[in-house]
């Protein structure tokens, strides 16, 4: 494994890039397909660490897969697991851990069908307490095997329909998990969201996909959902996994710094992903964007406008703004991103630390970063904290006069294994 990658200074970025399939869509699609009673053909399924963990878990529950080039056939079990494994290892895949907690609570048949969910060291630091607190009062059998509120944990049966409440301010994955699980219960349920809901576009993504898989949920208000019970996931026959809109943000930023044009294939005006809205951010920072149905083209002048913006809806893509801020004409403030602290690493602290190593002046608050433009560049090695987004974000520093070294670039295998080879292809001096 390459321990670091040295990026010489770049001035230009142009060409065409095809995005890998979205991790968020891929893992939802895998689980929904596994809950269907008839096969589902998935197209453009991302092959990465996170999707591999979900596939391995579903396979251990009895689901089988058939791969043929860019097509994956999922032979679902309709929610009735065939002699499920007693332990599922999910690495650091939050998009696997959180929904499986809820779905297993809804589908395991008896107390003798216990399943342990565990992950790597970082996963055991990522909170699930709000999700567990939502399902335990309705009968879900959950035993913490380590620190209370965190994996590893043991799941057994018992979840009953009824009224559910959950704090929406920590992670939208908890809400998506319940939306996927509650339709499987024998009776009707309601789900009420408390607090300031974070990453709402990911909830909208889940609702759209549930509809595609035959599940009906009524949104009584932005904070309350009526969920009929006794539903069955219906195979759509074939399902296309969109390109990763979060990954598109790096190419939009590179096109702004390197002038472009860069055609980004896989996400366009018809995308169901909230992170497509990053295109509006990059326009505010000085880029020009033209949209098509499933692609967009981005160009820039090399000049970056500083911004002050609330990123509650698109926190993942918001990370890309941080390195861009170093090139800006005035300070940039990234607001309302408290949930960065419960991601693959504490992203607020990690981002501030690495920006300061470059020499930047950074104000780190509980839920914001304020970043001053950098006047004098120096070449340093960026630590990535086993976080794919840290690695990809800081690749943009290669557009400085000093270049940059990225430690542990292999962490990009989580969502974008080919990122640095694509970066070298499109970005040059």
Curated annotation (Swiss-Prot):
Cross-referenced InterPro entries: Enolpyruvate_Tfrase_dom, Enolpyruvate_Tfrase_sf, EPSP_synthase, EPSP_synthase_CS, RNA3'P_cycl/enolpyr_Trfase_a/b
Catalytic activity from the UniProt record: 3-phosphoshikimate + phosphoenolpyruvate = 5-O-(1-carboxyvinyl)-3-phosphoshikimate + phosphate
Pathway assigned to this chain's UniProt record: Metabolic intermediate biosynthesis; chorismate biosynthesis; chorismate from D-erythrose 4-phosphate and phosphoenolpyruvate: step 6/7
Active site: 316
Binding-site list for phosphoenolpyruvate: 23, 94, 126, 173, 347, 389, 414
UniProt-listed PROSITE patterns: EPSP_SYNTHASE_1, EPSP_SYNTHASE_2
Gene3D superfamilies the UniProt entry points to: Enolpyruvate transferase domain
Catalytic activity, EC: 2.5.1.19
Subcellular localization, as worded in the UniProt entry: Cytoplasm
Listed GO MF terms: 3-phosphoshikimate 1-carboxyvinyltransferase activity
Chain segments annotated as coiled-coil in the UniProt record: none
Enzyme class name: transferase
Keyword vocabulary terms for this entry: Amino-acid biosynthesis, Aromatic amino acid biosynthesis, Cytoplasm, Transferase
Domain of life: Bacteria
Membership in a protein family: Belongs to the EPSP synthase family.
Role description: Catalyzes the transfer of the enolpyruvyl moiety of phosphoenolpyruvate (PEP) to the 5-hydroxyl of shikimate-3-phosphate (S3P) to produce enolpyruvyl shikimate-3-phosphate and inorganic phosphate.
Subunit (UniProt): Monomer.
Protein name as catalogued: 3-phosphoshikimate 1-carboxyvinyltransferase
Native organism taxonomy: Bacteria, Pseudomonadati, Pseudomonadota, Gammaproteobacteria, Alteromonadales
